[in-house]
Amino acid sequence: MQGLGIIAEYNPFHNGHLYHITNSLEQIRPDFVMAVMSGNWVQRGEPAIIDKWTRAEMALNQGVDLVVELPFLWATQSAREFAQGAVALLKDSGVISYQSFGSETGDLTLLQRAAKLSLEESEHFRQTLHNYLDQGFNFSEALAKALNLNELASNDILGIEYLKSHDLLSSDISCITVQRQGSPYHKSEISGKFSSATAIRQAAKNGDLSLIKHTVPDQTWNLLSQNKTDWIFFKMLEQHILYKFRITNKETIEQLMEWEQGLENRIYNASLDSCTLEEFISKLKTKRYTRTRLNRLMLHALMEIDKSLLNHFNTTGPPYLRVLGMNQRGRQALKTISDRASLPILTRPARDLRSLSHYCRQCFHWEVKASAFYNLLKQKDGREEYIRPPIVHPD
């Protein structure tokens, strides 16, 4: 059985994602497609606009056969840890022959060369990278300059990290890349059929529903419309974040994963001086401390997740394959996975976790906390993680 693996967030699923899947299927023609998808919180350190179950259904509507969750602890870290956690799940499933990822360059050879140079990390490369960081460039800009590339966009960076992860994990999965279509990843305005997820979320936040409709498949549009009252935006965390940092001491801030020397004083002072989230972020944001990096720091502070805890989990990796949804082809694939995988499968956590290791239960504990907080933002029950079964999609 040959599986095609895709690592995604689908926040929300849009026409660019459909193009990626369609193009990948034309190149590979696999027996099934498995997506490793972020849960209720995404790599930008933000809540997903709509919950993971609905987003899994969006994916199943458009060519994905099996959706597995990337646990919260990896889904909300930097590109390197995000990629390592997700690639580990593809590898440990035992059934994935190919991974397809989107990239701005569409040039696999170039990305492989960049990954090789980054992995080798010669003294010259390390020093060059740090020199650019010290000059105030953010990581993606500094990495591009250190690799003598004109520019590396968000999906290029992730692609490099996927390739590095396959090497570090001794994975025999082959990679392909599909060039990203339409507007840049961070562009916040709708611009045609292939608009970015950022632009789609911004239009949703502004209530411009008519602008969204032509940027997503019809079934995605229906799910977004039907669940409009459950949309979640980062702004909803405003009071939680300001309160947290006003009562948090500097020593605690220093233990956060994204922290660097001196930031604790700026955070503490900004929290006292700011009355809105935008004001707070504007006092902290620099070229090096991007909004995304600050978002992750703020989320980890809210969840009381420090660098020692993340280092503990990063050392071992995701401990299970948690199924969010599947169709009939996905169910057949899951039977093969149960025979070949090096990790246990979770379909009903309340039952399955009883026989699993303390490490598995520890990891799932953070999933429960993260989803309970997410559901609080939309005034829903906080016990969902233990009791909700996977979506079974009709073919």
Curated annotation (Swiss-Prot):
Leader sequence residues: none
Localization per record: Cytoplasm
Binding annotation for ATP: 7-20, 102, 155, 180
Record's keyword terms, sorted: ATP-binding, Cytoplasm, Ligase, Nucleotide-binding, RNA-binding, tRNA processing, tRNA-binding
E.C. number(s) listed in UniProt: 6.3.4.-
Primary location recorded for the protein, binned into one broad class: cytoplasm
Single Gene Ontology BP annotation: tRNA modification
GO CC annotation, single: cytoplasm
InterPro entries tied to this protein: Rossmann-like_a/b/a_fold (IPR014729), tRNA(Met)_cyd_acetate_ligase (IPR008513)
Superkingdom, natural source: Bacteria
Catalysed conversion reaction: cytidine(34) in elongator tRNA(Met) + acetate + ATP = N(4)-acetylcytidine(34) in elongator tRNA(Met) + AMP + diphosphate
Regions that span the bilayer: none
GO MF assignments: ATP binding; ligase activity, forming carbon-nitrogen bonds; tRNA binding
SUPFAM superfamilies: Nucleotidylyl transferase
HAMAP family in alphabetical order: TmcAL
Reported function: Catalyzes the formation of N(4)-acetylcytidine (ac(4)C) at the wobble position of elongator tRNA(Met), using acetate and ATP as substrates. First activates an acetate ion to form acetyladenylate (Ac-AMP) and then transfers the acetyl group to tRNA to form ac(4)C34.
Sequence similarity: Belongs to the TmcAL family.
Designated name of the protein: tRNA(Met) cytidine acetate ligase
Organism from which the protein derives: Natranaerobius thermophilus (strain ATCC BAA-1301 / DSM 18059 / JW/NM-WN-LF)
Gene of this entry: tmcAL
